[in-house]
Amino acid sequence: MDAAQADKAASSPVEAHAEVAALLASGAVGEAQAALDAALARWPKNPKLVLVKGEVLAKASPVQAATHYASLTSDPALAPWAASRLADLLPLPTATAEEAVALMEAVCDGAVDRPIKEPILDALLEAGDDAAKARLIEIAGSKSKIFKYESKLAVARTESGDFGGAIAVLANARAEGRLSVHAAVLYADLLASSDRLADSIALLEEIYAQNPDHADLSRRLTMMLQRARDFDRAAEVFEQAVARWPQDWMLVYRLNRLPIAHDRYERVLALLLEGAGSALKTNERLRFQAALAVLHADDPTRGFELMEAKFTPPVSILAVPVQKALKTRDAKAWRSASRLVDDRTKEVQVTRSPDPRGTVVITTGITFGNLPLAFIDAIFAAQGFNVIYLRDFGKRVYLRGVASLGASEEETIAVLKRMAGELGGKRLIAMGSSSGGFSAMRVGALMGADVCVSLSGQTALASYLDATRVSAWNPNFFVKVQMEREGDLPFDLVPVLSRPSKTKFLQFYGADDEEDTRQALRLKGIANVLLIPVRGVGDHFVVDHMIADGSFDALLKELGT
């Protein structure tokens, strides 16, 4: 600096800042830049000068100015001012993906408080293409310590199949006290899908104890306890839910499928009916499910009464076939003719006929169609069949066997063949509805049954989920991922049904149900397979229609000859 320049130079940082600001205000950007450079050479760490540099840069390049401000956020003393000025520059439509990533990293690493950090991150996440946004979410979710972005990252990793990475994000958020109740449900699903069922249950128990009025927590905990076969605790949680939400028809729907001891079932049902009150008259979904629940209990007459009134769409689609099926016998006849007192906590139950025409192995869930198993047994009893009722609490459509019969599918098949031989009867039949239909075809084929009957059964379970929406909040997404991870399991019926065999395979399906038709037609052309479309049926419960029109009784008569 020569003598003349020294005479003109500012005598203090304050004076220099004022000079630069005045030059900027007058539009003399070049002179402002020169004055600032001279001032910074003398006072390189002066806060006002460092900050006003961003204003100078912004005149030529807002992106350069934003980068400058972002770099200043590492200084706790400057961070509030720099972050505020950075926020004023956003959005930056001309920023490249790399520039946006650099800004995101600097702000996340900087000493920026959440009230100003969050709008900056939100604005940055709006920029760029999907690939850039994925990188930005990765940075925000792993570095910001703001749960909104951690949640986004956990969801993104989940939907990309990186369950371990998603678990790591949520575990860290939980350890640092940021995990939301909603995200805890996702965390539990991820743990359960990663062979950590005990950890999933422990998490849900802890969060549920803190949030007993959160319905989704109650549902998930009940479901996980069922999967772990802790039926007593599952029933406790379910009973608490009924006490809180007795008019929730979905609760009654789940009650109809809950593995629960008979005495507790009666108590829960009484609690539910008492709490439902007048909603039983005004809510058709609730009335239909409550009617099925009562039929499962020891009061078929009341179940018939609840089913008596008219149902309208969409409830009528399921309810009307059940109404018609029930009318094929009176209420007392259904119960008196049945040999089964259904214990839903048992995997294997057997009913016998004195002079059996054959033995039927039924691979079922909780129900067979929409009627209680005890009612179904009345039909088989009338036709003189022994029945072996199976449940698969492992939720693997019997492909890993039934635990109480064997440690594998092979061991289970061997025990079932022995049981069927001991029960007697000249014919061995396997039968199931929906996923139970898939299982009946496979189990029957492996047992060497005379006939296998699938009622609206899938033929390729994985393809049944082809249209599953990829979403961390879609339960079927986890089902599909789990199936893909268990690729060694034979989820396709075509190979086993294509083997040389004397077994006859009958595939019944609703002729007007698009997906069931697609599944059935996969078996077209296989020897010994007979495809039987049921005309006028456009839903998944073909068995209810067949019971209603008498064709199910006719089928059993034919099978027994």
Predicted regions and their residues:
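Short, surface-exposed "cap/lid" segments of acyl-processing enzymes
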Residues: 334-385, 392-396
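Single-residue signature of alpha-solenoid repeat helices
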Residues: 32, 65, 99-100, 132-133, ...
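Structural motif corresponding to the intra-repeat A-B loop/turn of tetratricopeptide repeats
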Residues: 26, 59-60, 93-94, 127, ...
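The feature captures the conserved acid-bearing segment of alpha/beta-hydrolase catalytic domains
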Residues: 471-533, 539-544, 550-560
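Short coil turns that delineate tetratricopeptide repeat
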Residues: 10-11, 44, 77, 111-112, ...
